[in-house]
Amino acid sequence: MISPDLPAALKSALEARLHGQSRRDAGERAGRISASYRSGGNSGTITSEADAIAYATVRMPATYAAVAASLNALMQANPDFAPASLLDVGAGPGTASFAAAEAFSSLASYSAMDSNPALRSLAMALADDATRLRGLTYALGPARTLLDRAERADLVIASYMIGELTEVERAATIDALLARTNGTLLIVEPGTPAGYQRIIAARDRLIATGAHVAAPCPHAAACPLIAPDWCHFVQRLARSRAHRELKGADVPFEDEKFSFIALTRQPASQRPGARVLAQPLVTKVGATAKLCRADGTAAVVSIPRRDKPAFAAARRWDWGDGVTPP
């Protein structure tokens, strides 16, 4: 399992590029870009090196944490998966590539694609500072076009990118993502109701083509959650001093909400029997947890303290864990 925090070398390389820039200006740039994303915009608002560095300083730690948590769930479900090649689609500053490099020592080939020149330049500069990623190839252009001529990869990741596409583009791109996948496709989106709906649409579409769910779902049936409920997870990460300064934040940590789906060509070898869908409640009486279960149902289960083995396990559960249900 890998840490949700940026590797020390990546953190230092990113902060070195921020050195000498006005923190106030960088914070304002990051704020404008984030506001554009929240209102439905895309990376087109990132037009310069200064924009890319400011945005990466503020958002790269959180997106890295979400991808890392998703990869951890994948590794739990499929511990023998040892990809040799990665395709990072909508790669931005290379966040998912760095997370995958931490997760899989087997990776030897890294390819990325994105339509934003400023983010590509930053990714290539950061990759040059990282031994594992120095051979990164990074194509510039629309994902849908580039995917048609991309090499297949053992691991394909699309993190925080399908939400930037129109509905028609999204369906075609999701099909193309799976077509380029030899082993596992991981899609990560913001943990909002809209992000969850995009994940569910991709899940349903790709299951229908024969893909297998590795994580987070312990089953391939329809999602049992009913609106206004939705499946999402939370990953806590540490904020660096630069991160806090640019966000104007005092709290030394951040909680990133995300939704994801990991789909495989072959069934996962150790998919857990249940997934914890919210932070469990532990009291003097026992533990209560909301679980998505292998039979395709979701339920709140109670584990009494008197059931010592089951309670000992349940009291250690966290939101997002794959567990053995009582």
Annotate each PLM feature.
Residues E245-P326:
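C-terminal lobe and adjacent flexible extensions of AdoMet/dcAdoMet transferase-like proteins
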Residues D154-V168:
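A short SAM/SAH-binding and catalytic strip from SAM-dependent methyltransferases
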Residues M1-N42:
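N-terminal auxiliary segments of SAM/dcSAM-dependent transferases
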